[in-house]
């Protein structure tokens, strides 16, 4: 994976969004990788997840506006649906998920 890292420390799974040059903005690839990472978590090996962003400037700067400006209407709708699906998966994940917010936490 290019933009998501996952590591286990003891009984804690740590997911890091790793696009610090783009302030960890969410693009299609980040959403796909985050979705796949959540699916791959061994829920018997960890007791909780920490979600954080790489670097000190930004946790997540919202959606990647650069990518969004290139999408067709249908692609934009699919991007929005994918984002909603991934966020719903985080909200309903069977383990506690802690957001370790470092820097900006923006929506959009």
Go through each PLM region and give its residues.
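Conserved CoA-thioester-binding segment of acyl-CoA-metabolizing enzymes
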Residues: 1-52, 88
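Residues at secondary-structure transition points
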Residues: 3, 21, 25, 32, ...
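Histidine-centered beta-alpha loop that forms part of the nucleotide-sugar donor binding/catalytic region
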Residues: 18, 63, 102
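Hydrophobic pocket-lining residues within nucleotide cofactor-binding pockets
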Residues: 26, 65, 101
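Structured helix-beta-strand junction loops
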Residues: 44-45, 71, 93
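Glycine- (often His-adjacent) and acidic-residue-rich active-site loop
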Residues: 53-89, 105
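Glycine-rich beta-to-alpha active-site loop
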Residues: 89-108
């Amino acid at each position: 994976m290019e933009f998501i890292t996952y590591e286990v420390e003891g009984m804690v799974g740590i997911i890091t969004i790793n696009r610090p040059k783009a302030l960890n903005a969410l693009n299609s690839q980040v959403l796909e990788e985050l979705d796949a990472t959540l699916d791959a978590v061994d829920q018997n090996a960890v007791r909780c997840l920490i979600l954080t962003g790489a670097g000190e400037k930004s946790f997540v700067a919202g959606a990647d506006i650069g990518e969004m400006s290139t999408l067709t209407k249908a692609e934009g709708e699919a991007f929005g649906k994918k984002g909603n699906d991934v966020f719903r998966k985080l909200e309903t994940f069977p383990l506690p998920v802690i957001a370790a917010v470092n820097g900006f936490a923006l929506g959009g």
